[in-house]
Amino acid sequence: MIRPFLLLAAVGLLTACAQQPLRGTGDLGVVVERATGSLQIIESSNQSQIARIEGLGDLSHASVVFSRDQRYAYVFGRDGGLTKVDLLRHRIDRRVIQGGNSIGGAISQDGTLIAVGNYEPGGVKVFDAKTLELVADIPATPLADGSRNARVVGVIDVPGRRFIYSLFDTDETWLLDFSQGNEPQITRFEGIGRQPYDALLTPEGRYYIAGLFGEDGMAKIDLWHPERGVERILDGYGRGEQKLPVYKMPHLEGWTVAGNQTFVPAVGQHRVLVMDSQNWQQTAAIDVAGQPIFVMARPDARQIWVNFAHPDNHRVQVIDSETHEIIADLEPGPAVLHMEFTARGDQLWLSVRDGEEIQVWDPYTLKLLKRLPAHSPSGIFFSSRAHETGL
């Protein structure tokens, strides 16, 4: 009796496997559909759409990080929602409303903690990545009038199970250290500059750089030597004396490092600035079609792709990183919001919000490969981000 039973069990297992074929997650990604509060699961091997996940709330300024096994996407919604999406089962695994107005988050180096930055209530909440249970609640500095706490921006994971972020209203940067457990050690950097609005981490995880909305210049913290405090850099970076109208602030995560050069979107100017990655001094300025938003390097650093704010957001320009010449001026369609390279750079995916589509380009031939329908697409995120610090 035992042998037939084992045979039957084996047949049942094989049948189940046939119904749900095994696949990896390394080529998977997601597209945020901001108008419908939904998420598309995509795959780059065949440039196809796999599933649509609905019920994710307000995704008007959503961002996404991934678990270290690349199976789960954590979606930070503007309505304070934190949603864990299973990319293999095509469903919401867990969801919590953790605040009233969220502006992004990060996953710790070891993949165990999720930090969410909040405008309302101002502060950071940290969750267990498996269960989404609250681990720590760190309120931001109260305003002088006591009306509310400062708004949190630029939450980034840094090496050593740490998170770093800035406080827009009180001109501070805080470093949370969870390396000794779930009670963080907090280091506060005060007076970093007026109104930090976003931040980036250099690729090796050493420097945290905060952009300043209230004045020109930027604030840099050396995370190898946090005791040295804040250093002001790039005094000319900003709107300058002319105070040009800014249609959309560039994302500092849209900075890109290519060799010894860093390419930076200039605020309120039709220029991409080039900096020396060692001394943070400007070395060149490249005239472009409009106010740049994302400035992104192909993974081999040979090209720089740039998209723009309104009214030039139908265009994308490609810059040669060596000569600084514009080698292509593309018009993918109305309202190009975001771009994402596959991990090894063979494809460039971009979202065309008002064209209701995602486009896949070959960044070597500069040819359009495929168009895929989408509901007001914005952010595109591939699961390979799981293995990059600061994304």
Curated annotation (Swiss-Prot):
Its main location: cytoplasm. InterPro entries: Cyt_cd1_C_sf, Haem_d1_sf, Host-pathogen_enzymatic-act. The keyword Cytoplasm applies. The keyword S-adenosyl-L-methionine does not apply. SUPFAM superfamilies: C-terminal (heme d1) domain of cytochrome cd1-nitrite reductase. Keywords: Cytoplasm. Pfam families: Cytochrom_D1 (PF02239). GO terms for cellular component: cytoplasm. It is found in: Cytoplasm. Required for the biosynthesis of heme d1 of nitrite reductase. Could have a dehydrogenase activity yielding sirohydrochlorin from precorrin-2 or dehydrogenation of propionate side chain C17. This is Protein NirF.
